[in-house]
């Protein structure tokens, strides 16, 4: 049956991309690294829920910007040494300082140790002693799991970045604003290095889901976002555009123009990614690194 399909309908099917072995290796590592990120988020959320049930001082001590930092090296080291509020009350400033150094902190150790000591030794709601002790055992088990997950993530991140650095396209990809070794590895993993895979930039944009869909009937036209897309590219593109807006004046101006025109944040970000992908396709085809002046060239002012 498969042979007959190829004989009669070969024109209706696309051939698999002819990516190099190097690109396929980067794809394996980049996707494994992304799965490790999701594993860390899942275990971190489990830890946060458990800590919130009996150890509120830990939530306050390791509160970050927008989320808790219980998965940080310092938090994991200190919570392993003091898995319950009872253990935390016995910690001294000197002991906390030693734990911070053990976790890798080098600056502001004394100041941070005093801050943590004030929070962890302050009065807080407590569970009954047997329940608190049982939850402490549970906490240690989750921390051991989180240590393994964080170790795997660090190892896969280093491997993905190292594999990407040896690829010939790495120089062009990382020349774009907002693209570091990890984001570059994720982009290469999904786009590949087969130059014949995408006939033009429009094909790449449609594959990534950044190109809008226009439905027209008579005098009416509806422009909507594309739902069929490669979510891996979208995830990498989100981080790319967030960073590009901060470090590229041209990208910032493009985003601001779309926002001023009435686009939502996600729509303006998608528009920017659509434009950046088009430029990435062109630069990969030519092998020439990114040029900010050419990428976001402004039209000359009209003559008076």
Positions of predicted regions on the chain:
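A detector of single, family-specific signature residues
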Residues: 1-304
């Amino acid at each position: 049956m498969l042979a007959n399909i190829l004989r009669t309908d070969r024109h209706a099917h696309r051939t698999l991309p002819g990516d190099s072995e190097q690109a396929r290796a980067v794809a394996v590592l980049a996707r494994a690294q992304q799965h490790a990120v999701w594993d860390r988020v899942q275990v971190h959320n489990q830890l946060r829920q458990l800590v919130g049930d009996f150890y509120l001082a830990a939530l306050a001590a390791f509160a970050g910007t927008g989320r808790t930092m219980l998965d940080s090296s310092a938090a994991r080291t200190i919570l392993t040494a003091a898995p319950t509020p009872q253990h935390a009350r016995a910690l001294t400033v000197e002991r906390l300082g030693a734990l911070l150094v053990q976790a890798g902190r080098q600056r502001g150790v004394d100041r941070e140790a005093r801050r943590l000591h004030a929070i962890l030794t302050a009065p807080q709601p407590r569970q009954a002693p047997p329940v608190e002790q049982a939850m402490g055992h549970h906490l240690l088990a989750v921390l051991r799991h989180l240590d393994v997950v964080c170790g795997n993530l660090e190892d896969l991140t280093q491997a993905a970045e190292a594999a990407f650095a040896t690829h010939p396209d790495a120089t062009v990809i990382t020349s774009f604003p907002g693209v570091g070794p990890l984001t570059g590895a994720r982009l290469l993993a999904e786009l590949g290095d087969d130059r014949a895979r995408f006939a033009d930039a429009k094909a790449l944009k449609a594959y990534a889901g950044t190109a809008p869909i226009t439905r027209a009937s008579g005098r009416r036209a509806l422009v909507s976002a594309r739902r069929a897309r490669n979510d891996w590219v979208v995830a990498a593109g989100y981080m790319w555009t967030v960073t590009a807006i901060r470090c590229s004046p041209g990208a910032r101006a493009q985003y601001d123009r779309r926002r001023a025109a009435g686009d939502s944040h996600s729509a303006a970000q998608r528009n920017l990614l659509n434009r950046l992908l088009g430029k990435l396709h062109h630069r990969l085809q030519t092998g020439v690194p990114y040029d900010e002046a050419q990428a976001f060239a402004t039209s000359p002012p009209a003559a008076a």
